Amino acid sequence: MSIPKSCEVLVAGGGPAGSYAASALAREGVDVVLLEADKHPRYHIGESMLPSIRPLLRFIDLEETFEKHGFQKKLGAAFKLTAKREGYTDFVAAHGPNGYSWNVVRSESDELLFKHAAKSGALTFQGVKVDSLEFEPYDSDFPSGGKVANPGRPVAARWSAKDGRSGTISFQYLVDATGRAGITSTKYLKNRKFNEGLKNLAIWGYYKGARPWAEGTPRENQPYFEGMRDGAGWCWTIPLHNGTVSVGAVLRSDLFFAKKKSLGEDVTNAMIMAECMKLCPTIKELLEPAELVSDIKQATDYSYSASAYAGPYFRIVGDAGCFIDPFFSSGHHLAMAGALAAAVSIRASMKGDCSEYEASNWHARKVDEGYTLFLLVVMAALKQIRMQEEPVLSDIDDDGFDRAFQFLKPVIQGSGSAEIVKRFTKKEVSEAIDFAVLALDNMAGAGEHANETNGSNGTGETNGDAKTLENITVEDEKVLSGIRILAKVAPSADMKDLEGTAIDGFMPRLEHGHLGLNRV
């Protein structure tokens, strides 16, 4: 099948975000073309999911396919931030016997999503990369600012295929799901900004024969995340259904290179991995009988966001817009929730539920709120890891840690905003997010993210004056805005928070055949 000359919606990128957006739109009868630069199945890191993924899959009739595929069930997860003890999030206790999520082999799960887009009615093409976009001026009452931009209206994309073909496709709407390449943000808007406190580097590999965590208990073989004892970062073990365990380490890039230098000229990533494991004694013990069955891979793991996630007739989703440290497995949730927001807002614009500006703004705000929520909880955990003995979250004793960990649980478990409102006092939230002031500024109305006023020059680079994660503080009013964020956008395992959340006077209408926005 040849790539058509035109379509209603072009989705650039066939990862989880792009495939989900294509499915959601095609199921509404929209003429969708999905272009993926690579060919499935293809390798990707990011194997652990939150329970909030289930209702998102259910909405496009893909939950049962995931259930039957045989992925490793994720009943919960353990997090050991300090040397004292671990906290555990129990998905099944929170949501019932079917409240679990999965650990996935990404080559398999991403292919399921991509194929489902075709089953839903999208025209899908692999090995086809979007190289450039063509814009036309768009001055129709569409001001830049907030989380939207107006570089003009994208009307066509130039593409090239691995088999040597090339061409142009015109469209009415664009969904940019081009992953970290982020063609719209990096090439045209030039608005990607890195979080100076989360400039990390990851190394990882796959093992066989590891001991399961919590063997002989109901928590046996669940994912385990452990902070390094020197505060440099954290390590993970994620069991997979193919008999391997994904094991990796995420640490500050400056400390990674310091470790590398200290080990001498002939250092390998395997040697650095071994040094990291020494600082995570529980994981080190689990790996004692295990055998490494892959190379040790390496990638930058910088967290970033953007000043805009939408504009005239385009939406940015998934890693194309923002990426956050994967400590709490937020990637799939943010990708699919953002993709659904794109589909909702595009249908709203198409059907006249609201203006294109209002639809774009709703999408951009939805993406930004999700990113900010996970930024808060990730920074809370990572600050505790880096400070180790200092009680960032609460008193570091057994009871105190359990109380502090309740701050994180509703977000990780997908318990929704009601649980957060019930559980926390101003003091508890203050202890957890006092370092996140600049991330909160945007939600409080200042319109800026942490790195935009804390060391970023607006070009994706950072200067040397940025505060470290350990030193950021916040005033009381910003703490209160943090409570509002948590109360408003915490993910839910039944999508009730997405359906019941109004942004600028609009609520999503999640009905098949009637997808869009309702004015409230």
UniProtKB/Swiss-Prot annotation:
Disulfide bonds: none annotated. Keywords: FAD, Flavoprotein, Monooxygenase, Oxidoreductase. Pathway: Secondary metabolite biosynthesis. Its EC number is 1.14.14.-. GO terms for biological process: secondary metabolite biosynthetic process. The keyword Flavoprotein applies. Chloride binds at residues 330-331. It comes from the Eukaryota. InterPro entries: FAD/NAD-bd_sf, Flavin-dep_Halogenase_NPB, Flavin_halogenase. One of its GO terms (molecular function) is monooxygenase activity. The keyword Flavoprotein applies. FAD binds at residues 14, 17, 47. Disruption phenotype: Abolishes the production of radicicol and accumulates 6-dechloro-radicicol, also known as monocillin I. Radicicol is an important pharmacophore as an inhibitor of heat shock protein 90 (Hsp90), an ATP-dependent chaperone involved in the post-translational maturation and stabilization of over one hundred proteins, and which activity has been implicated in diverse pathologies ranging from oncology to neurodegenerative and infectious diseases. Non-heme halogenase; part of the gene cluster that mediates the biosynthesis of radicicol, a resorcylic acid lactone (RAL) that irreversibly inhibits the HSP90 molecular chaperone, an important target for cancer chemotherapy. The cluster encodes only two apparent post-PKS enzymes, a cytochrome P450 monooxygenase (radP) and a non-heme halogenase (radH) that introduce the epoxide and the chlorine, respectively. If this cluster includes all the genes required for radicicol biosynthesis, the remaining structural features of radicicol are presumably generated by the PKSs rads1 and rads2. Belongs to the flavin-dependent halogenase family. This is Flavin-dependent halogenase radH. It comes from Floropilus chiversii.
